[in-house]
């Protein structure tokens, strides 16, 4: 336990919070070929691989994911939410933050209904998150 004098000389440092989605906090200056600090809510990227992954221990499924090269040249794994998708290699997608708890190494989500990604077909409830238009009935 420090004395009051020690705390006066060198006060306690508060922990700095690390970002949950660090690739969205980097920009890339292609003219200078260097990274800059540039926070953004989403980033555009190109799919380099689309596949399935099995989740961690108590769960069992084939979760869809895509390896995406972002506009700042960082490659990340992003989860494809919803049932069915139209993504393939070279598809242009919009990536947002948000991890998938049972997939190790997946810290990003692909935004459905933006750029080359279609919305989920036949979805009636909770359409906003899945890029589905209102049905005409």
Swiss-Prot record:
CDD domains for the chain: Ribosomal_S12
Disulfide bonds: none
Stretch list, region Disordered: 1-55, 118-137
GO cellular component terms attached to this protein's record: small ribosomal subunit
Record-level GO BP terms: translation
Domain of life: Bacteria
Function statement: With S4 and S5 plays an important role in translational accuracy.
Family membership noted in the UniProt record: Belongs to the universal ribosomal protein uS12 family.
UniProt subunit comment: Part of the 30S ribosomal subunit. Contacts proteins S8 and S17. May interact with IF1 in the 30S initiation complex.
Alphabetical list of NCBIfam families matching this protein: rpsL_bact (TIGR00981)
Identification of the protein by name: Small ribosomal subunit protein uS12
Gene expressing this chain: rpsL
